[in-house]
């Protein structure tokens, strides 16, 4: 499967870039009841809670990464990402765990 990347933004409303370190694993959780964005996915850390959101606007999604709406159908309700790059306004992460299983032919090929 081709690697998938997402952009985390909005962290300046929480703890800034301080919680983010290259290689750090972050839990992402779909938030369909979010009043501002039905496709919202929050980024969380166990000890401190919400640290940002997966970008879902063409103005905030880094080139080459998926938006919250673009990744939502490919991942489970909770999934894990790994921090790859950090800038002052964006954190680029690779999705490392929590993909939905493919059904049909691809699943049959995996069993062989």
What are these regions (language model features)?
Residues 1-112:
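Conserved active-site motif detector
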């Amino acid at each position: 499967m081709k690697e998938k990347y997402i952009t985390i933004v909005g962290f300046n409303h929480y703890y800034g870039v301080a919680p983010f370190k290259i290689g750090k694993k972050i839990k992402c959780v779909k938030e369909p009841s979010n009043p501002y964005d039905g496709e919202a996915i929050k980024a969380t850390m166990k000890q401190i809670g919400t640290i940002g959101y997966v970008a879902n606007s063409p103005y905030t999604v880094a080139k080459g990464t998926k938006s919250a709406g673009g990744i939502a159908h490919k991942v489970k309700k909770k999934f894990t990402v790994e921090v790859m790059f950090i800038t002052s306004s964006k954190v680029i992460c690779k999705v490392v765990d929590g993909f939905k299983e493919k059904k049909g032919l691809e699943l049959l090929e995996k069993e062989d």
